[in-house]
């Protein structure tokens, strides 16, 4: 028995040479595969963050998921706050590529003052079905979902629920742990677009974020279900403000108020969110760095969405389209989820402004096409 214990103490990860371990990325279309070379892999392979996260943990999801039909995926994740520094040779070029030339020396800006948003309360409700703003936050001192332990995940849940239970007024609400829900209750919340999906997404599974499901996961929402917080899905926290119709101003107002209150409640508990002046708010996926903000509307645009210039219009407006049910879905009945393409290098107010102005223009184009008119005079300049 002593011999076995002695052997266990000396156990190290058995790996072959970097050449033999380097993944085959020849069929891949994601940001990680564009950047990672064998030389870089060799250089980064023997590094680990203080929590033991390695380059193989960073890239696994991008190896297992070569590409995506709708969007160019990032193909990597962070396991902790230090990942972005320890593996910066890989992650800096990916961040620059994904975030429109954002340089390693650039500094991020934050603006959560809803008074700085112009308009936004007048999107046409005949076209705009619902409006939503979300972001993610990571709690300092814990590993991120791809690498956290069961105990850490439960610690994040406990701390979050204690903070959220202190919210009052129209933000007052209740926490619902996933493990206490029936399948029918879960499915109803998913169908109503309130809850994250069951862990079927290959991006979630391959990165290790679905371990121990549903332990430590849940949803907190206010009584009217217009302010929600997801706990321990892709990020420690996803903060969401949403409602039916086109009043993005109201949605953003609630978002800023609630988010600021939550941050204060965490500070009162002696902890803070992961943030630095270069990357802004640090989150699991490099695509969400900076603001972590996605302002989206479900909008009925059956005509413009079939137009030859639709993709070009979106690109110029710095907008992204998704299917009706989110990132892995197709559009139903010409209804698309239209949101800001950027997260980093722009402030929260600037991103919501782009969505408000851009969606207004898309609705204007849709109305012209309904009448059989040309939209050439409405073509926007590149933002």
From Swiss-Prot:
Exists in many tissues, but preferentially in testis. Its EC number is 2.7.3.2. It catalyses: creatine + ATP = N-phosphocreatine + ADP + H(+). The keyword Kinase applies. ATP binds at residues 130-134, 193, 238, 294, 322-327, 337. It is an enzyme of class 2 (transferase). Disulfide bonds: none annotated. Keywords: ATP-binding, Kinase, Nucleotide-binding, Transferase. Residues 99-112 have a biased composition (Basic and acidic residues). Residues 99-119 are annotated as: Disordered. Residues 14-100 form the Phosphagen kinase N-terminal domain. One of its GO terms (biological process) is phosphocreatine biosynthetic process. GO terms for molecular function: ATP binding; creatine kinase activity. It comes from the Eukaryota. InterPro entries: ATP-guanido_PTrfase (IPR000749), ATP-guanido_PTrfase_AS (IPR022415), ATP-guanido_PTrfase_cat (IPR022414), ATP-guanido_PTrfase_N (IPR022413), ATP-guanido_PTrfase_N_sf (IPR036802), Gln_synth/guanido_kin_cat_dom (IPR014746). Residues 127-369 form the Phosphagen kinase C-terminal domain. One of its GO terms (cellular component) is extracellular space. Belongs to the ATP:guanido phosphotransferase family. Reversibly catalyzes the transfer of phosphate between ATP and various phosphogens (e.g. creatine phosphate). Creatine kinase isoenzymes play a central role in energy transduction in tissues with large, fluctuating energy demands, such as skeletal muscle, heart, brain and spermatozoa. PANTHER family: ARGININE OR CREATINE KINASE, CREATINE KINASE B-TYPE. This is Creatine kinase, testis isozyme. It comes from Oncorhynchus mykiss. The gene is tck1.
């Amino acid at each position: 028995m002593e011999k076995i214990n002695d052997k266990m103490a000396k156990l190290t990860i058995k790996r072959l040479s970097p050449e033999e371990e380097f993944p085959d990325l020849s069929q891949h279309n994601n940001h990680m595969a564009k950047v990672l070379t064998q030389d870089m892999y060799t250089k980064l392979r023997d590094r680990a963050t203080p929590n033991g996260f390695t380059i193989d943990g960073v890239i696994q999801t991008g190896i297992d998921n070569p590409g995506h039909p709708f969007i160019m995926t990032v193909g990597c994740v962070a396991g902790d706050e230090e990942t972005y520094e320890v593996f910066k040779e890989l992650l800096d070029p990916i961040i620059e590529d994904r975030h429109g030339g954002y340089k390693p020396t650039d500094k991020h800006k934050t603006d959560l003052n809803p008074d700085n948003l112009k308009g936004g309360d007048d999107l046409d409700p005949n076209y705009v079905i619902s409006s939503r703003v979300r972001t993610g936050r990571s709690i300092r001192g814990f590993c991120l979902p791809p690498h956290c332990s069961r105990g850490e995940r439960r610690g994040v849940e406990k701390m979050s629920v204690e903070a959220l239970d202190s919210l009052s007024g129209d933000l007052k609400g209740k926490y619902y742990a996933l493990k206490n829900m029936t399948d029918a209750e879960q499915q109803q919340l998913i169908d109503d677009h309130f809850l994250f999906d069951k862990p079927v997404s290959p991006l979630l599974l391959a990165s290790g974020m679905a371990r121990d499901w549903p332990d430590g996961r849940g949803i907190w929402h206010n009584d009217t279900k217009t302010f929600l917080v997801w706990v321990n899905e892709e990020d420690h926290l996803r903060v969401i403000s949403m409602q039916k119709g086109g009043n993005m101003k109201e949605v953003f107002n609630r978002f800023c108020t609630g988010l600021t209150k939550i941050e204060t409640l965490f500070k009162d508990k002696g902890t803070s969110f992961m943030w630095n002046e270069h990357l802004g708010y640090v989150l699991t996926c490099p695509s969400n760095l900076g603001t972590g903000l996605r302002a989206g509307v479900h909008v009925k645009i059956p005509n413009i969405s079939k137009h030859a210039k639709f993709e070009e219009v979106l690109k110029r407006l710095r907008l992204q389209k998704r299917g009706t049910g989110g990132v892995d879905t197709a559009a139903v009945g010409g209804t698309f989820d239209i949101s800001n393409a950027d997260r980093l290098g722009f402030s929260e107010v600037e991103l919501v402004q782009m969505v408000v102005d851009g969606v207004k223009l898309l609705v204007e184009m849709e109305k012209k096409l309904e009448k059989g008119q040309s939209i050439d005079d409405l073509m926007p300049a590149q933002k």
